[in-house]
Amino acid sequence: MPVAVGPYGQSQPSCFDRVKMGFVMGCAVGMAAGALFGTFSCLRIGMRGRELMGGIGKTMMQSGGTFGTFMAIGMGIRC
């Protein structure tokens, strides 16, 4: 697929750049959601201190990676 040229001679981002941008945006949104849901679920089962921070971090990484992967796939389909 040829690269489209926008106004003022600017080129559009490549397909790989779009997929990469989708992954980063998905990671950011997924980690924010994971922080909220992870905090709630860890506090609900009674975690405190280091265990709480580990549980929240684990949930943030899992949800960030999952949502980032799906966003990257979605951006790849749109290329």
Curated annotation (Swiss-Prot):
Induction data: By the anticancer drug fluorouracil (5FU).
Principal location: mitochondrion
Cellular component GO terms, alphabetical: mitochondrial inner membrane; mitochondrion; TIM23 mitochondrial import inner membrane translocase complex
Localization (cell): Mitochondrion inner membrane
GO biological process, one term: defense response to Gram-negative bacterium
Plastid keyword on record: no
Stretches for region Sufficient for antibacterial activity: 42-60
Pfam families, alphabetized: Romo1
InterPro entries: Romo1/Mgr2
A GO MF term: monoatomic cation transmembrane transporter activity
Domain of life: Eukaryota
Transmembrane region(s): 22-44
Keywords: Antibiotic, Antimicrobial, Membrane, Mitochondrion, Mitochondrion inner membrane, Transmembrane, Transmembrane helix
Membrane topology reported for the UniProt record: Single-pass membrane protein
Expressed in which tissues: Up-regulated in a number of cancer cell lines when compared to a normal lung fibroblast cell line. Highly expressed in brain tumors.
Cited function: Induces production of reactive oxygen species (ROS) which are necessary for cell proliferation. May play a role in inducing oxidative DNA damage and replicative senescence. May play a role in the coordination of mitochondrial morphology and cell proliferation.
Family assignment from sequence similarity: Belongs to the MGR2 family.
Other information: Enforced expression in IMR-90 cells leads to increased levels of ROS and induces premature cell senescence and nuclear DNA damage.
Protein name stated in the entry: Reactive oxygen species modulator 1
